[in-house]
């Protein structure tokens, strides 16, 4: 997917309208608790400002449901960004309207303003053409650097591209496409995919698309129990999708037909209930008892998965191995993160597909040891499913 990027346009003296993903978590005092998404956008922001561009940033924050709600104002983000780039960031009162237009036209080279939350207007998520046209009028060129919303056809990601002469990808989207695209198109082999999470239903399309690309698939998380039940094993009170048993068998069959090594856990960590105080023990998947639930992969499985990871040249991970939020059931997820960090050090390309896996890697303190951590959970999942992302498809080739 070759798209024009920030490097292909002349920035000096131009009003550059850039869609970023500043949807950051805030606490009750409205302080930003994790500024990763702002930091991820800095390379594009700095490039535009250093080259004398006049930058207009736009983003959504939270789910204000199309109404103005001060709780979801981007003002704290403007303050944080200003601190990070050591430059004043003007905060607009709205994202469209005469006053906003006047402020945009008044920007000088190297100055930056942030528009107020796009989702204060229902037209944003409805991809309303009039709203998109009004946004487009603010800039002379459009840059999309919001990978996290690239799978949504919204006014600021897809609609806007119909009203601007130039629409290119920012550096973050370029980086996402480079790593995720290379993994799917020209991976160094062996290529191992690790899939976790609670439900097969959320990962069917990913599995079916990855079966065309990978050599080995390692499966963890509660979705293993749907496979086990389909295979006739006791699953106790573990989470099972009873309406997906046939599907589980067909996925196993597909893997076999394609000569893909698909590994399921040999043992799990079982407990009578999901709680931090519950007694737990490792048990073979063939010996799980009726009143028990499996909540993590066990030590034998960790070792087997570790060997596969360390023997790989490309590793893609999406979804935790267990309930890593509770220490008793976090070993599997952290062991996978550690094995991936080791594999990276040995020269493998390691890619984390956003969401819970990214949170787990951060919690393990290993984020800097991975080749690439995707910033978009839903967007990276759809990309891995082989779907076209509207926000990226709409950019200039």
Curated annotation (Swiss-Prot):
Q: Where does this protein reside within or beyond the cell?
A: Cytoplasm
InterPro entries, A to Z: Phosphoglycerate_kinase (IPR001576), Phosphoglycerate_kinase_N (IPR015824), Phosphoglycerate_kinase_sf (IPR036043)
Keyword set, alphabetical order: ATP-binding, Cytoplasm, Glycolysis, Kinase, Nucleotide-binding, Transferase
The yes or no answer to whether the keyword ATP-binding is present is yes
Which annotated residues bind substrate? Answer: 21-23, 37, 60-63, 119, 152
Enzyme type, top EC level: transferase
GO cellular component terms, alphabetically, are: cytosol
Q: What is its EC number?
A: 2.7.2.3
Pathway given for this chain reads: Carbohydrate degradation; glycolysis; pyruvate from D-glyceraldehyde 3-phosphate: step 2/5
On subunit structure and binding partners, the annotation says: Monomer.
Protein's name according to its UniProt entry:
Phosphoglycerate kinase
- Can you name the source organism? Chlorobium phaeovibrioides (strain DSM 265 / 1930)
In the UniProt record, the gene name given for this protein reads pgk
């Amino acid at each position: 997917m070759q798209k024009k990027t920030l490097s292909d346009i002349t920035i000096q003296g131009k009003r550059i309208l850039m869609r970023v993903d500043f949807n950051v978590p805030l606490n009750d005092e409205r302080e930003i608790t994790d500024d990763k998404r702002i930091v991820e956008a800095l390379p594009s922001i700095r490039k535009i400002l250093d080259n004398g561009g006049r930058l207009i940033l736009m983003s959504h924050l939270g789910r204000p449901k199309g109404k103005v709600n001060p709780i979801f104002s981007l003002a704290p983000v403007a303050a944080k960004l200003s601190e990070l780039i050591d430059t004043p960031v003007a905060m607009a009162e709205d994202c469209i309207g005469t006053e906003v237009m006047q402020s945009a036209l008044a920007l000088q080279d190297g100055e930056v303003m942030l528009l107020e939350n796009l989702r204060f207007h229902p037209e944003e998520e409805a991809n309303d053409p009039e709203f998109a046209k009004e946004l487009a009028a603010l800039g002379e060129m459009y840059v999309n650097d919001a990978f996290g919303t690239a799978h949504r056809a919204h006014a600021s990601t897809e609609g806007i591209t119909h009203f601007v002469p130039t629409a290119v990808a920012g550096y973050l989207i370029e980086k996402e496409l480079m790593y995720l695209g290379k993994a799917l198109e020209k991976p160094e082999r062996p290529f191992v995919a690790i899939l976790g999470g609670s439900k097969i239903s959320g990962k069917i399309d990913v599995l079916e698309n990855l079966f065309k690309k990978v050599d080995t698939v390692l499966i963890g998380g509660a979705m293993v129990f749907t496979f086990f039940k389909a295979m006739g094993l006791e699953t106790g009170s573990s989470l099972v999708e009873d309406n997906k048993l046939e599907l589980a068998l067909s996925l196993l069959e597909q893997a076999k037909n394609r000569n893909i090594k698909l590994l399921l856990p040999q043992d799990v960590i079982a407990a009578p209930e999901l709680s931090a105080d519950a007694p737990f023990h490792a048990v073979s998947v063939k010996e799980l008892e009726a009143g028990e639930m499996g909540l993590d992969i066990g030590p034998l499985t960790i070792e087997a998965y570790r060997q596969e990871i360390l023997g790989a040249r490309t590793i893609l991970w999406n979804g935790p191995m267990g309930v890593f939020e509770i220490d008793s059931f976090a070993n599997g997820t952290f062991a996978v993160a550690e094995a991936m960090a080791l594999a990276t050090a040995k020269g493998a390309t390691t890619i984390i597909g956003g969401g819970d896996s990214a949170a787990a890697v951060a919690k393990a303190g290993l984020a800097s040891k991975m080749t690439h951590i995707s910033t978009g959970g839903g967007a990276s999942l759809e990309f891995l499913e082989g779907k076209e992302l509207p926000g990226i498809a709409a950019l200039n080739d």
